[in-house]
Amino acid sequence: MIKVLKKKLIVGLEIGTTKTTISVGEILEDDTINIIGIGLSKSIGIDRGIINDLKSIVECIKKVINQAETMANCNITSIYLALSNKYINCQNEIGIIPILQEEITKNDIENVIHTAKSVRIRNEHKILHIIPQEYSIDERTGIKNPIGLSGIRMQAIVHLITCHSSIKKNIIKAVESCGIRVDYSVFSGLASSESVLTTDERNLGVCIVDIGGGTTDIAIYTNGTLKHSCVIPYAGNTVTNDISYVFNIPFMYAEKIKIKYGYAMQSSDITEEEIKIVNEDNTIIQTFHKDKLTEVIESRYIELLTLINEEIKNTQKKLKKSGRIHKLGAGIVLTGGASNIKLFKNCAEKVFNIPVRIGCPKKNNINTAKLTNNTQTGSLSTVIGLLYFGKKYFYSHRNKNSYNFFKKWLQYINNWIKKEF
């Protein structure tokens, strides 16, 4: 008799301004993730993470689900959902508790984190993530894992990421309208960090910048933990809008020429080649030179990168003022679809004045053989990161359930012994 093993599937869904993407991963016996399905569709009905046409975005979600189910030969029932919009905020908070036992236990950790998160957050906001940064015991600071240590008082610094509840609720409603359950909502910047950053980069200090169509996600790590996160409501579509306006052409044509001919900065490689915009009837509707196109693109990208640089500098000042590690030894990692434009790394280094690399999903512990070259460009960084995130959640949830079962079983035995003896 052949034993059929149930597949351990994880599904990630990103509903972006320009595209809706879904990925299906299978957790294999060797603990790697094998991507077995993918779905891609142009997004309609959402702008910068906020739904403006529920019916249209539901159709987009259904389309990518059908694509992924066909490719993976599976039935999708639940997903991990990426969130990115200008109403995502972060704050670092402190919790303090007395240490009552000889040694610090897991319960103490839970209590001090609970104290730190029990703060006033913005109206209509709900907490998405609670991320411990470091602990202090009496005068000892910078402790990463205090379990088993002794002391009188423990302090925790945690990073809280929040989202406007109605915006999150509407996106979940769109997913549930497709008959799909949302297992967990994840800030897109965290998901991209999971797929793109290395442990060494987080320890040295790094800032990941995920530039999509409508929003730019920023996450800053020092000493191995997340110190700051935010969303800037400007991204690749802002550049496309400029091209559309300057050359008086439809947005659709502007996006195509940005992808085909675009450079993020001037270069000797750029000639005075004439670009012709042709409509569906093969009629020329506009002509202009490539160097003029580059001029438009470069000015907007420099403006966006300057905004990002100001956010990074302000965060570093706050970290330095509080006596915490603030240097970004590993520099800046750029990812997302809008980072694919030629010479973007060079343009970014001119603004940031520190090392920059273009990040794409890591190849370790994940098999992307079924995917196209999109994985090499960073366009799928978030949706693949959701698979990494989902695997962690899968195991932690399973271990928690096992622990609760064992706890209930012990309680049952204790009650039985008391009753019988």
Curated annotation (Swiss-Prot):
SMART domains: FtsA. SUPFAM superfamilies: Actin-like ATPase domain. It is found in: Cell membrane. CDD domains: ASKHA_NBD_FtsA. It is a peripheral membrane protein. Keywords: Cell cycle, Cell division, Cell membrane, Membrane. NCBIfam families: ftsA, PRK09472.1. Cell division protein that is involved in the assembly of the Z ring. May serve as a membrane anchor for the Z ring. Self-interacts. Interacts with FtsZ. This is Cell division protein FtsA. The gene is ftsA.
